[in-house]
Amino acid sequence: EVGLSAGLFYFPKYGEYEKYEASKRDISISDLQLVSWLLGECASVDDIKEAISKVRIISLDPQISTVHWRFADISGRQLVLEIIGGEPRFYENTLGVLTNSPGFDWQLTNLNNYVNLFPGAAPGQSLGVLRLSPFGSGSGFLGIPGDVTPPSRFVRAAFYQTSAPRQKTALDVVFQAFQILNSFDIPIGIEVATGEVAADIPSATQWTSVTDMQNRIVYFRTMYNSAIRSIDLNTIDFSSVQYHAKPLDRSKQQPIELSLIHI
């Protein structure tokens, strides 16, 4: 309700929380409960840094993957939080991008491998008497990784969002964000070997969301319905509302709009 946003992302094999100690249970909080607690207590990323300094982040089940977090406030400032060796590490996220493992600092370093990429078309050149020309627009991004691994998604997101043109309205920004995010949909099936059965909760893109923090509106679409829907947070009284959950989809069949052509 104050324009603070938070996101939790799987961070397997690289995070390490503090060990749970019964004597310190009053200042301990589960990694999966952290987002809800911070959104209820804080109004800015500075508030979050102060709040984290007063608690111990633990896991209720050490067998479950560790996670890391992205926080953003209405000023546009973003932070990444990772727990490494039991110690919280904050990173200023000026790119506004986060995926999964490896760590955020590694992902930034990896961008140096793609210093040759640029928006637009690559210039033509000559090989002796042979003249070479790009096949089409966007050839400046030839070589950008296209797979769905976290490092590749990080690279694509960094270059796509920084090259996106500025929009005039908030709604235009929302539509542009969804268009960019089209490039990150992970289809069901590629996460399991041939012949294996996907889990009940597949490691695929189940929903995509875009948050207009200025106007307090959350937009989303799902794997079953690509129509964009919204939740207006201004209509919710957060001082009195109780916990509430409902399915993202009423039906797993997307309605198809019929267009009539009059001749």
Cite the ranges covered by each PLM segment.
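Extended amphipathic alpha-helical segments with heptad-repeat/coiled-coil character used for oligomerization
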Residues: Q63-P119
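Long, charge-rich alpha-helical interaction segments
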Residues: Q107-L171
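Conserved small/polar residues in nucleotide/adenosyl-binding loops
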Residues: I261-I263
